Amino acid sequence: MKTKFLFITGGVVSSLGKGLAAASIGALMEARGLRVSMQKMDPYINVDPGTMSPFQHGEVFVTDDGAETDLDLGHYERYTSARLSQKSNFTTGQVYDSVIRKERRGDYLGGTVQVIPHITNEIKAKILANSKDVDVAIVEVGGTVGDIESLPFLEAIRQFRVERGRENVLYLHLTLVPYIPTAGELKTKPTQHSVKELREIGIQPDILLCRCDREIPRDMKAKIALFCNVSEEAVVTARDVECIYEVPIAYHEEGLDERIIDYLNIWTKAPDLTDWERIVRRFKEPESETTIAIVGKYVELTESYKSLSEALIHGGIANNCRVNLIYVDSESLERHGVGDTFKDVDGILVPGGFGHRGSEGKIAAIRYARENRIPFFGICLGMQMAVVEFARNVCGIDDCFSSEFKEDAANPVIHIMENQKKVTRKGGTMRLGAYPCQLVEGTLARRIFGTGDVEERHRHRYEFNNAYQERLEKGGLVISGVYRDVGLVEIVEIEDHPWFLGCQFHPEFRSRPMEPHPLFESFVGASLKHHGEA
C-alpha cells in the first residue's frame, strides 16, 4: 500500500494537546493493524531543545540514538509500538542549517536560496525520510496556526497534497470550542477564525478535532461544518477525559478513526482496544493507593517531569493502585528544612537535573529517605546526590561533593567523565542515547530486571568517581550495575534498606502503559508496601 500522510495542525491557543491527539491516532491506527510512523516538526530556531530551560520547554525526551527531542515524542512512544529516532523530530534550526550547508557546498549551483522552494523542499525531504515502510505517516506541526514561525512548514504540507495526491494526504486541525460560563454556551467563533487562517494559507482541513470540556451538540457541529467548509461528520468532539489513556477510546467512540480510514481509502480490521480499556479501568478503579514525592527544582512546571510522572502511573497500573504525586521544591527544602514535608509520603524520588541550585535540598530528602527507611529512587543527578549523601553521612568523607557544583572539592565522589573534559560546546555533546548495563548477581537491580544485561537511555556529563568505590562499598554501598566497556557505574543500592536504588540512566524514557518499566513497577510496589506498614 502506498504510504498515506496525516498532518495535524493546531489553532486558537497552544497546549491544546496536539501531541496526545497524534499519539492517540497512532494508537488507533495500530489497533487496526496498520504500521505507523510518528514525527514532530518544531518551528523554533534552536537546533534541538537540549539547551532550553525546562521552564520554557518542559521535558527533553531522549531517543535510543541520542536525539534530544520534544516531550511529545514521549507520548508517541508510550501510545504506539514505535521506537523513535533523530528523524522523528526536527526544527527550523535544523532545516536552515542543512540548507545553508548545502549552499556552501555549491549544491544549488549558484541559485538564489529562498524559503520557497529550498526550505520547503528540505522540510518535505525530512518528512519523507521518516515515512519509509509504513502505512500511515502521522506528522504533527508544532506551534499554532497564525504564528509566523510555522509558515514554511504549513506551505510544505500544502505542497505535499499537490504532489502526493488528495487521496493520500489528510489534514486534521485541532481547535478549541470554549464554554463561556457567564453566557452559558459554547462558542464556535475561535474555531471559525482558526480555520479561516488555515484556508488563507491554502490548506482546507478535512477533519476538525474540537477540544471541549463537554459534548458538542449536533446543531453546533452543523454550524462549525457550515462555516469551516467541512462535512458535519468531519467535526469531531475531543472532550476532556479523566485519564489521558482514555483518549484513544474517546476518539474511537466519536468515530475519528473511521473517518480517517474512510478518507484515506484504507481497508482495515476493526480496532482491538482491549488493552486500553484494561488500563483505563485500572486507573479509575484501583484497589489501593500510595503517595510518592518528586523532589526537584523544576516543579513549578510539572511538564518538566512528564515521562517521569507517566512512568510512575504505569507502575501504579501494574500494581493496581493509584499513585498520588506530590511535587516538592528542592530549593524550599534548603531554605526551610525537611520538617514534616514527607510525613505522609510512601516513596521519595529525586529525578535528573542540572546546576547547583537545590542540590542540598535533594541531599536532605535522600538522607530522610535513608534514615527513615522510606523507599527511595534516584535518577541521573538523583543517583549522584545519593552517592554524595552516603559518602558524607555514612562514610564520613569530609568536603565531599560533585565537581559539577564544587570544582575544588577535596573529595569529588562525582566527577566529569574523561571524554567530556575538553568539551566546550553545550548542545548535543553529553553522553546521550542507549548504552548497555551489566547487572551484578544477587542485587536488587538484578532481581527487578530478571536478567544480567539491559540497555537504557542516558543524558549526562558527570559520573561516579571510581577512586572512591572501595571506600564507599566498605560503608555499605552496593554497585549493582556497570557499563563494563569503560567501568562506568550505572546503578547503586544500599544494604539493609527496604528499597533504595539510584541509576545513572533515565528508565522513564522506556516505560509504557502496556509495558511498565521494571524499576518503576518495583518502586511503586515498595511504596505501596510501605503505605500498608505505615
Curated annotation (Swiss-Prot):
Enzyme Commission number, as recorded: 6.3.4.2
Binding of CTP, residues: S14, D147, I148, E149, K187, T188, K189, P190, T191, Q192, K223
Pfam families: CTP_synth_N, GATase
Binding site for L-glutamine: G353, L381, G382, M383, Q384, E404, R461
Class in the EC hierarchy, top level: ligase
Annotated Mg(2+) binding sites: D72, E140
Residues that coordinate or bind UTP: S14, K187, T188, K189, P190, T191, Q192, K223
Keywords of the record: ATP-binding, Glutamine amidotransferase, Ligase, Magnesium, Metal-binding, Nucleotide-binding, Pyrimidine biosynthesis
Gene Ontology biological-process annotations: 'de novo' CTP biosynthetic process; pyrimidine nucleobase biosynthetic process
Pathway: Pyrimidine metabolism; CTP biosynthesis via de novo pathway; CTP from UDP: step 2/2
Summary of activators and inhibitors of this protein: Allosterically activated by GTP, when glutamine is the substrate; GTP has no effect on the reaction when ammonia is the substrate. The allosteric effector GTP functions by stabilizing the protein conformation that binds the tetrahedral intermediate(s) formed during glutamine hydrolysis. Inhibited by the product CTP, via allosteric rather than competitive inhibition.
Residues annotated as binding ATP: S15, L16, G17, K18, G19, L20, D72, R239, D240, V241
Gene Ontology terms: cellular component: cytosol
Note: CTPSs have evolved a hybrid strategy for distinguishing between UTP and CTP. The overlapping regions of the product feedback inhibitory and substrate sites recognize a common feature in both compounds, the triphosphate moiety. To differentiate isosteric substrate and product pyrimidine rings, an additional pocket far from the expected kinase/ligase catalytic site, specifically recognizes the cytosine and ribose portions of the product inhibitor.
Family: Belongs to the CTP synthase family.
Protein name in the entry: CTP synthase
Phylogenetic placement of the source organism: Bacteria, Pseudomonadati, Thermodesulfobacteriota, Desulfuromonadia, Desulfuromonadales
Gene of this entry: pyrG
